Structure formats: C-alpha cells, structure tokens
C-alpha cells in the first residue's frame, strides 16, 4: 500500500511550492510507521490531502484531510506565520490520532 498524497497549493502560496513539498515529504516519513498497519490490507485506501493558502497578512492557512481506509482525520488552522510549523503541527495531529487507535 502506497499512500496517495495530494498537495493543493493556492496561487497565493505557489512561490513556496518547493518548501511545502519538502516539508510534506519529511512529515510523511514521521508518520510512516503508523501507516504500516494498512500494508496488511491490500485493498486499503490511504489518501492524504494537504491544502495550503497564503493570507493577505503573510500568514498561512492549512488543511490536512486524511482518509485512512475509511477513517477520517481532519486538521485545519489559520494564522500560522511559519509554514514549517503549520505543516509539522498538521502531521503531528495526524500522528497523535493514529497513535490513539
């Protein structure tokens, strides 16, 4: 099972695309161990969608929607001025939700 990761980067944040892609890739590595349980299900669908938008005050708005074989994990935050903090918080939230199961 290979997780499907979808990045939706608003035109307002397009100039940060490389950084967003790198941060999401790094963060996926941190939740990889928690996603391994879905390897046992060959028909499992693991889809993680990350949406990033830059606000007019130079802060960022981000969403993480994960569908892990029917289990939903949702995270949304506004007003993060550091893009890395926003993405790391989103994946930390997902990791905590997975660890609790």
Give each language-model segment a name:
Residues 1-101:
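N-terminal, polar/charged subdomain of small-to-medium soluble alpha/beta proteins
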């Amino acid at each position: 099972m290979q997780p499907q990761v979808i990045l939706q980067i608003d035109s307002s944040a397009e100039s940060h695309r490389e950084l967003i892609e790198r941060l999401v890739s790094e963060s996926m590595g941190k939740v990889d161990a928690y996603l391994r349980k879905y390897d046992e299900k060959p028909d499992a669908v693991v889809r993680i969608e990350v949406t990033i938008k830059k606000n007019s005050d130079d802060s960022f708005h981000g969403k993480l929607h994960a569908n892990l074989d029917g289990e939903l994990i949702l995270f949304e935050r506004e007003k993060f001025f550091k893009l890395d903090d926003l993405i790391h918080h989103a994946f930390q939230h997902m990791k905590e939700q997975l660890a609790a199961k």
